Amino acid sequence: MIPVTTLKDRKVALFGLGGSGFATARALIAGGAEVTAWDDNPDSVAKASAEGIRTEDLHGIDWSQQALFVLSPGVPLTHPKPHWTVDLARAAGVDIVGDVELFVRERRAHAPDCPFIAITGTNGKSTTTALIAHILKSAGYDTQLGGNIGTAVLTLDPPKAGRYYVVECSSYQIDLAPTLNPSAGILLNLTPDHLDRHGTMQHYADVKERLVAGSDVAIVGIDDSHSALIADRVERAGVKVVRISRRNAVASGIYAEGIRLVQAVGGAMLPFADLDGIQTLRGSHNAQNAAAAVAACLAVGVSADAIRAGLASFPGLKHRMQPVGKRGRVVFVNDSKATNADAAAPALSSYDRIYWIAGGLPKAGGITTLAPYFPRIAKAYLIGEAAAEFAATLGEAVPYEISGTLERAVAHAAADAERDEAAASAVMLSPACASFDQYRNFEVRGDAFVSHVAALDGMTMLIGPATGEK
């Protein structure tokens, strides 16, 4: 835990007692703050009270006495309308921050020189974050991994000299971190997302820009127009910018040339790493993630050889284009995290012959945007509520069956793929749908896929059964 000592003996109001909010309350108390916490969920309040956290409806506190208001990132700050606690804090002139801001202040107070890499972007954040942490750990560095990737940042070990922090930041967390100042800040890309919480694309982009604008080194993907403009603007403001691209050469930075990463420096184009054969980094989207990781690790002093070794040994992330098993020429891929068509596209673009398991609770737009990848699909196996809709979209372009259940889809796809005479093929769960019609969440769906694959005869598992761990 990181005790928040910068608020010792100060009164702090806190709203939101979910996972990160609960951890934040404990970190504040450990640092000596006088915390008053609340949540709209009575069960969360009861749990906090049972753990010794002082709880009180924030309608009734004296806001003029509060040094700070700490808001959980899942609570609306501006859109669709500010949460009632936000209105109360603003009316009293109390600053509003989140857990990442508290971490930033503790680092600044106790170990301002310890390397801190922050990662954001619409897509690829978690893979890039995990890859950077893996490279650092593999190279022998004391590495702390947290943030939006699933480990609350204040549950990490406290800042000290020589300790490296790798923190994934959502737009909500950045919005609540006004003094965010990483050693290296990464903005991977920007496409419309979370506009219900940010109002406009411009506001969403402005929030993301703050992370790189406050960085010592800004690493920016320039393959979309919003991010390219941000790179130019931040550079004009005097920040060192390293540009990355998966599509085009850059004058200075890291870019992908097919499956190779190239470092552009001082007018020279130097081959840096070959991603061929690294199953967990297949696809052009992962080339961009790898380019960002390379740039960040170079920025904090990791040697080129250590970075290459880390790339080659990266185990990947659960449920994200994750090779889980192999039988003969057929690889089985868990991409359960692909909960919409855009998220499924990278996996479909990364294999040439696919037995595709898709469906679940459909999202608006269905799978029409995936038509360019239909020639790669040998057959589709449709499950869940989306089956009929997806069947209509596939029409005569792709052979399909309505399997109904994931277990049946895995069995049928595996049998068909085994009969395929192609040199290599993939049985892939990349549902392009939410899971809630059949599973509690995408993780449970992915674990079910792993279990069904593990039950097949003659299977060589690449991970532990139903755990997704190497």
From Swiss-Prot:
ATP binds at G121, T122, N123, G124, K125, S126, T127. It catalyses: UDP-N-acetyl-alpha-D-muramoyl-L-alanine + D-glutamate + ATP = UDP-N-acetyl-alpha-D-muramoyl-L-alanyl-D-glutamate + ADP + phosphate + H(+). One of its GO terms (molecular function) is UDP-N-acetylmuramoylalanine-D-glutamate ligase activity. Its EC number is 6.3.2.9. GO terms for biological process: cell division; cell wall organization; peptidoglycan biosynthetic process; regulation of cell shape. Pathway: Cell wall biogenesis; peptidoglycan biosynthesis. It is found in: Cytoplasm. InterPro entries: Folylpolyglutamate_synth_CS, Mur-like_cat_sf, Mur_ligase_C_dom_sf, Mur_ligase_cen, MurD. SUPFAM superfamilies: MurCD N-terminal domain (SSF51984), MurD-like peptide ligases, catalytic domain (SSF53623), MurD-like peptide ligases, peptide-binding domain (SSF53244). GO terms for cellular component: cytoplasm. Pfam families: Mur_ligase_M. Keywords: ATP-binding, Cell cycle, Cell division, Cell shape, Cell wall biogenesis/degradation, Cytoplasm, Ligase, Nucleotide-binding, Peptidoglycan synthesis. Belongs to the MurCDEF family. Cell wall formation. Catalyzes the addition of glutamate to the nucleotide precursor UDP-N-acetylmuramoyl-L-alanine (UMA). PANTHER family: UDP-N-ACETYLMURAMOYLALANINE--D-GLUTAMATE LIGASE (PTHR43692:SF1). This is UDP-N-acetylmuramoylalanine--D-glutamate ligase. It comes from Rhizobium etli (strain ATCC 51251 / DSM 11541 / JCM 21823 / NBRC 15573 / CFN 42).
